[in-house]
Amino acid sequence: MGVSHARAQCKPDDAHRKSCSTLRVSATGENSAQSERGSGQSGIRVSVVVPVFRPGPSFDDLIASLDRQSLAPTAFEVLLCDDGSGEPTGARLAEVARTRPHVRVLSLPHSGWPGMPRNHGVDAARGTYVQFVDQDDYLFDTALEKLCDYADANVSDVVVGKEVGIGRPLPSRIFRRDIPDAKLGTDPLLEMLTPHKLFRTAFLRENGIRFPEGRVRLEDHLFVMRAYFAASTISVLASVPCYAWVKEPGSASSARIDPETYFPHLETVLDVVEAHTEPGRLRDRLLRHWFRGKILKRVAGRRMVKYPDDYRERLLDVVTPLVQKRFGPGVDSGLGFPNRIRAALLRADRRADLVSLAGFEAGLTCRAVVTAARWSRGGGLYLTLRVDITNDGRDALVFETVATDASDTDSSASGQKKSTRLTSLPLSSVDGLPPDLLVVDRELRNDRVDVFLREETGDDRHLAGRRPRDLATVAVSIDPLKVFDAQDDSRGGRLIVKVRRAGWTFEVPLHAEPATLARLGRSPMLAGRPCTLVATGDGVVELRREWPGGRMKDAAGRAIRRLRKAVRRG
């Protein structure tokens, strides 16, 4: 069934609808028709729905963030949906609501999972929109106002507001730019399948889009995908930070999964995708997201090696037939080189080879060293790096390039094409595997070395990068006046190198011998504020930038550059 038919797929059955209606009246004490809620007629633009169960101290941060919202309290409501916490949580929530007329507490029977409380929040919502927030997270000060304005402007059914990870890394592609009308399969919507989004309340109700209730893994994926398929307009608001997603120790996502119960829930999500797409490129592209993120990463590298033997066998007993049944060659084709190998080994049930591959990956070591450094008179810093990727002290990634017959490839009319294969993988044999499985040309074309400055805040600032021809001599150039603007108060930090080689990625500190950097000296006038490269006691390279001193030198450097540019134009 095509995407355009998505709305018809998301209706709950009558028994479920009746059950939810009964629970809603009990929880809210209201008998008004649901159609009177969520229309915005009350002046409430958005209902913030928070599933609550015995919250910790960070709950105060959430409430404080709601108190700071730029949207007037009369324009939004907060629904604290208590999942049977008991005392003292009940008293704590009552105290929050006592001094805030726009806060309501829904006291619910315990379900043990956030789906049921969220559903009650949607049922009770009076706002035009619903924004889901978890009890350990918080909103940025302008979030509700900006999200509602953006949804109004684009007539959005769903708005994905920019999420910021607190103590956790988050995908970045989805938030590179605002996307008023995002499309599944074209825009990176699958990068962020959390429920921390703004939804049009009437849209959820009309399409019967609800969270599964009870202990259901990936319930957020199920809910969001149903919404994505049913939505007329999905918008991404990337220009404004909206949601702080806080990593708390012991969260459900931190625990090791139980294969026998987890993967049936994954298949339910896959069922939704297949129900709303025809076989072909779009379906393959969507399915690839879960194949890569929920299966292949669990059988890779150190993670796979560290599993107890019995757990590893249980995991493979479940995922091997799932892969054979649900993910075809079209899904594999868009995977990176390491994942294509893992997928082929899984599909062939080559368990010993999977473990050998994981051990090989776990033993990979990357090191990046400065072999030469100089300043140019124009203010540029030129570094030559050597990058080594080894395993047990030897080159880990060994390639062989051979000529192939043009009739067997998509080669040009010249009659021959060169093909590069990785020959150093510890596979027992390649018999029974796809013939071009070890061909790595596509990934080698995308090899990259990038240098970053790691700030005191932990943020990484991109300094330089390139696609190297030879990892033994990687030339990069850093222009301090382009990296730092005139008012930038950065004092520098450690230099980090991120390497992509044949589909594997590494992140390592940049090293150098002190003597190599000692010959470099201080930066010239046209580099702006004085910058110095030093090697710390452990040999790690730091860029140290003068601040707040050096203002006159910075201004002079910028002025001279502007003058030179004007002369060249003239």
What feature does the model see in each segment?
Residues 2, 20-40, 300-570:
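Basic, ligand-binding patches in group-transfer machinery
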Residues 2, 7, 14-18, 22-265:
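Nucleotide-sugar donor-binding/catalytic module of glycosyltransferases
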Residues 94, 267-274, 284-288, 316, ...:
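Generic detector of well-ordered alpha-helical segments enriched in charged/polar residues
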Residues 101-103, 140, 163, 206, ...:
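Generic preference for hydrophobic/aromatic residues in regular secondary structure cores
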Residues 121-123, 208-213, 261-265, 284-292, ...:
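Short secondary-structure transition/capping segments
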Residues 208-220, 289-291, 346-357:
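A broadly tuned preference for mixed-charge, low-complexity surface segments
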Residues 240-248, 253-280, 295, 306-323:
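Catalytic core of nucleotide-sugar-dependent glycosyltransferases
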Residues 282-306:
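P-loop NTPase catalytic cores that bind/hydrolyze ATP
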